[in-house]
């Protein structure tokens, strides 16, 4: 189906060998030109979803295939593919092949550098908690990029802002009938740190942030039962001295 809607050098299906040659012919300049054109097609107010997927491989010839955090748990080395998609347009605006041993949180710096080179302004990024780190938050603030990023509840910054509202969080006024969960927004301050090598100093200031807390009582109950089942399984293994 793809070959009927896209222009390429071959008449019908692209043979495997030809596809390898075609992909190998795409230069960094070609990619950047594509990213710039796609950036101009974006919808002004849509947000961009940034995520990474892993592709397992048996190849011993591809240098980027490395042992890392394999998401499929198939005990194979992998190559990572970082992608940015428009939420409304469903268009891919950016992609980058990465070595399989690079953690998600270490890729945001490269993404921001690429967006600066491409000259794409007013980006709104949405990311999962794998990208959360102090370095990334500071980098997003530095480049004046609006963002929404998930975070683990166990993090000190997240937990310290939850503690004052914890007792009243599950009260009636914070329940959303539409989404069937409890939600509350907390305004807080982020300690922004920027190192300036040229001036030989470090800038520290407070940035306003909003934290969105959600609680799904059904999921919490399921998680608690799953934890209890895991404890029972471990108990049986200890008592029988065999893996269950």
Residue spans for each PLM region:
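Anion-binding and metal-coordination hotspots
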Residues: 1-244
